Structures are given as C-alpha cells and as structure tokens.
C-alpha cells in the first residue's frame, strides 16, 4: 500500500484528532471519584475498569479512510506517555493522559500562530524541571507510616481491603521491597512475601 504523507497544519490536526479520541475515553477515570469504563472484547464478556492505562491500551483506532489517516499516531503518542507513567510509578496514567493531550493541543495552537516548535520544546523542558522541583517540595514522605500508606493505596485501588493489605505488605518488606500484584483465582485477598529475592 502506498504511503500518504501529511505536512504542517494538516499533519498536526490529524495527530491531535487521534489524541483527542483516546483522551476523551481515558479522562473519565480521573481521580478517586473518576467513573468506570466498560471495555468490550472480541472474546468473553466486557470488563469494567477505573484504570486509565487499561482504557488506553484497549483503544485501537482504525484508519479506515483518508479522513482518519494519522489519527493512530496521535493516539499512540498518548498511549506511550501513559505506558511510561505506568512503568515508572504504577499510577497517574490518567493524569499523564490529560496533561499530554492538553500540551499537544496548546502547542498546536502556538505553532499554528507562528511560534518556533523547538523553542516551545525548550520551554516545556524548563517548565517540567521547575514543576518537578515544586512537586518535590509539596510531597509528603509517608515511608514507614502504615496509616498513610493504607490511605494512598485505598484511593489508588478504590478498595479499603486492598489498601490495608498493601499497607501490611509494605510494612513487612520495608522501603526497598518490591510489590507485585497479580489477579488471583480465589475469592479472597491474599499476600505472599518472599525474602531474599532480587533482580539485578
């Protein structure tokens, strides 16, 4: 199949349109009061989730005609940001999706108005550095505070029992331990602590 190449405003508009499709689906899961999303599957029944990265991964944009060509690129940019956040922190994927979309949208407006894209990039990098410093000042160190860990885990999981279990496990493994969550086969929550295992 012959490749189609798009330039300038047309290319940016197509990328932004694809990013917006993914953004609109994921943004509803934002925060502890975010709504659930039902995901249809080609096999089995639908699944219900409150997790932004799960919603993002489930979206596959079909570039069926000339109108939708390039949309997939925009959606993949947002997915890439959400996946990276998930790999680094295991949470915050919806926030990253919302921020990434709005940065793309505003950058598109500025570029269309004649601003230099490379200078915009440098400005974003400087702003990100300052934001990270400020967030560091605002952050609370909750290491060793079982009650606060349980609160954060409860909000993240949306379930008090899971939050308490995570706090119990964190207390056992300490600040340098690694927590891995897997879907169980039974009906009860359970934990297992393995001492002395390390990945090098």
Regions found by a protein language model. Give the residues of each.
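N-terminal glycine-/lysine-enriched basic segments
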Residues: 1-194
